[in-house]
Every structure is written in C-alpha cells, then in structure tokens.
A protein has these predicted regions:
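Short beta-strand element of the alpha/beta-hydrolase
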Residues: 153-162
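Conserved alpha/beta-hydrolase "acid-adjacent" motif
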Residues: 329-335
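Short solvent-exposed beta->alpha transition segments
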Residues: 26-29, 41-88
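Alpha/beta-hydrolase active-site loop
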Residues: 208-229
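N-terminal cap/lid segment of alpha/beta-hydrolase-fold proteins
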Residues: 118-151
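Conserved alpha/beta-hydrolase
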Residues: 180-202
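Catalytic active-site module of serine/aspartate enzymes centered on a nucleophile-bearing elbow/loop
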Residues: 360, 365-397
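Short beta-strand/loop motif that positions the catalytic acidic residue
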Residues: 316, 322-324
Length: 397
C-alpha cells in the first residue's frame, strides 16, 4: 500500500579510514548491482556493523517483493549523483523501472562499508509559471484543470490518489488512470482537477497522519475547484481511488459536502489487514508487514485505529457511486460487499462491479498480478460512462 520503502540510513560514528570518491563509487556500483539482481547474501557482506544490526539478511531478503513491484530496470545501471554527507559518500541512482521511477540511494562510509540503503521517489518538478497550484499552508502542489469544450459551467470532479507518492496522473507502470479519467470525462462534459500528491512533491517531508498525507490537500483541491471559471461551484464532486476512496468519508466531513462522491476500489478494512491479504495472494513473506509498519510513524497507525469508513459514510450528506473491479487483488470484493451491506439503507448509493477489471480499472483475464500493470491500457468507456452519468444526474433524482 505504501510504496516508499526506507530500508535503512545509518551513519557510523567512527570514521576508520578515508576512501576516495572513485573507490567509493566502485563499492556503491557493486552494491547497486547486487541489490538489483537480489543477491542479498553478497550485498549484506558489504554492510557496516551498524547496518548489519539494523538490516540483517533475513530482513533484507524481505525487500524482494518491493523490487518485483518496481518491475525490470529499463536500462543498465544509471550514473549516480554523488554527494558528500558527514564524511561519507552518498550515491543517488535515478532508475527507470518498468513500473515507476525511483531513486536508489547508497551510502558508503570511509571504511568502504555500506552505511545506508534507501528506495525513495525522486523529487518532483517545481510548478510551472501560470500552472494551477493546490496550496495548503506552505505546501504547494502542481495541479491540472481539464475542462470540456463548449460552454459551461461544468460539473467538476476532484481526483484523490491511492497510497504512495503519486503524480497527478496516478501513474503506475505503463498506465495513467487519472489522465484517462480526466480525458474521458472531459469528452463527456465533466471537468476534473488532479494534482501531485504531497508525498511525491515533498518526498523528504514526513507526514504524521493521513490528514497531512491526503485529507488537507484534498480539501484544498476541492476549494480550488470551486473557484475555477467555467465550473459550477454547486456541482463539485470528489473521486477517490483506493486509499483516496478509503479516506473519502473523512475528506467529505472536513469541509463543505461535495455534490457527490465516487469511490473506485475503496477499501473498508484496515491497511495492514489488506497488506497481509496481498502478501498472501502473491506468496510474499509476511515479514514485509514489518517493513510497511516501519515506513510510517506510530502516529500514522494510531490515527487510523478504529476508523470505519462505512460508518462515517452513513453520516455524509451526499450521494455515492461505488465501483469495483472484480479481478482486483489489492482491494477485493470483500470490501465492496462491506460497502453494500453497510449502506444498504441509503437510497442515494449506487454500487457496481466489473468482472474484467483490476485495481487500476483496466481490463484483463484470469488472475491479476503486479506484472499486469506494466502492460499499457486505458479505463474502459463503460466506466467513464457510469461516472459521467452519476455526475450529470440532476440533484434529487
């Protein structure tokens, strides 16, 4: 669920010897190659004592599913950016994987040992002049407004990402579901606003809870959408995908009620429960749960303890459209049926599932696997039709 995975970053307090940058580069390159080919036994031999204690071989090997989710490295080993930090050399390899772009950061101490290893998203680009920006206090997130052709005012849908450091298109592998939604809905007379997620734009800035990670910026985006020329401020809708759908009831409770809420692959169960189910589905070691739990502070999990999105949704005074891919292994039909059961008393809730669709709402056959996301695809017209019909339906009907 949380795609940014910090393996370890430790600085040895004792500098035994000084290594020139060229020697350090050779060590870092070797460690990079071993990491990519998952030769964890060889890689672990390069660790400093502190690193070995923090990341023993059995934990290091548990990173294998993370590397599989990134996909294959599209090119050979990239030339790293080199920085000197506290007497150590830090090598930043910006890697184009088949599923995403990530930095692999390797720190070499003066003794020639690996003192740090990190997978993190590269810094996002700064907003372009004249570009829309979602502003929350000091946070500034580049945004894109997609308007239909013709005369407005148009209804508008604000798109809220799933977990992880997402760009404005919610790019996963070869696919960009939010771009599909923006273009497809514009062709159907519906405007959209999409933006770079905070954890993508500010990858080094910690977030204590989902309020900082998701909710505050979604509320700012909804407010920005209401201010746009050509948009009907009374018809501003919220669309959440995956974690964005999970948190949609909290977002809706944080400000003026949206005209309606669309949930795509909205989970109901706790994040760690879903993660366990995903690991079991993929045959991955359950030790990865420890990595996931450690990727966020205790305050993050405490904030979500006891959160019941269905119970909160019952209190939201807005119609819901809840859509689910039946081939989705990340958020399954179990969650969809929990929505159905929990909101069955509401007359303004529409639920629909699609037999061929996966978590990204792309068509496929048989068992869905992460490799499927590397195949280019697009959200089908029938999903776009269903969303547009919901948004354009007159209020009270």
């Amino acid at each position: 669920m949380i795609r940014k995975v910090v393996l370890c970053l430790l600085a040895s307090p004792i500098f035994i010897a000084s290594l020139c940058a060229a020697d350090s580069r050779a060590i870092a390159d070797g460690a990079f190659d071993e990491f990519i080919r998952q030769d964890f036994a060889s890689l672990a031999k390069r660790f400093s004592p502190e690193m070995s204690a923090a990341l023993p071989l059995e934990k290091l090997a548990g990173v294998s599913p993370v590397l599989k989710q990134l996909g294959a490295l599209r090119t050979g080993r990239p030339t790293p950016q080199i920085m000197a930090v506290q007497g150590m050399n830090v090598f930043i390899y910006t890697c184009d994987f088949s599923m995403t772009r990530m930095n692999i950061v390797i720190t070499v101490n003066p003794a020639g040992q690996i003192a740090g290893l990190q997978i993190a998203p590269p810094p996002a680009e700064a907003p372009k002049p004249g570009e829309l920006v979602v502003v929350t206090d000091s946070i500034k997130l580049p945004a894109t407004l997609a308007l239909p052709t013709g005369t407005g005012p148009f209804p508008i849908v604000v798109l809220v990402h799933g977990s992880g450091p997402n760009d404005r298109d919610e790019t996963v592998g070869a696919n960009a579901p939010f771009k599909d939604l923006a273009e497809g809905l514009a062709a159907r007379g519906v405007a959209t606003l999409r933006y770079v997620k905070r954890t993508k734009q500010y990858p080094q800035s910690p977030v204590a809870t989902v309020k900082e990670e998701v909710i505050d910026d979604a509320l700012s985006a909804l407010a920005l959408a209401r201010q746009q020329p050509g948009v009907d401020p009374q018809r501003v809708f919220l669309l959440g995908h995956s974690m964005g759908a999970y948190l949609a009831p909290r977002i809706a409770q944080g400000g003026p009620a949206p005209a309606g809420i669309v949930l795509l692959a909205g989970s109901v169960r706790p994040i760690l429960d879903l993660a366990r189910e995903q690991l079991q589905y993929l045959g991955a070691p359950l030790s990865m749960l420890d990595t996931l739990r450690a990727s966020a502070p205790a305050s993050y999990w405490d904030d979500l303890a006891g959160y019941d999105p269905v119970a909160l949704a019952r209190k939201v005074q807005a119609p819901f459209l809840i859509l689910q891919g039946e081939r989705d292994y990340q958020v399954t039909m179990t969650d969809f049926n929990l929505w159905r059961e929990g909101l069955k008393a509401r007359q303004d809730v529409t639920l629909k599932s699609y037999p061929k669709l996966n978590h990204l709402f792309l068509e496929g056959e048989g068992k869905s696997l992460p490799a499927e996301y590397s195949t280019p695809g697009h959200i089908p017209a029938y999903v776009l039709d269903d969303i547009a019909a919901f948004v354009k339906k007159p209020a009270g009907r």
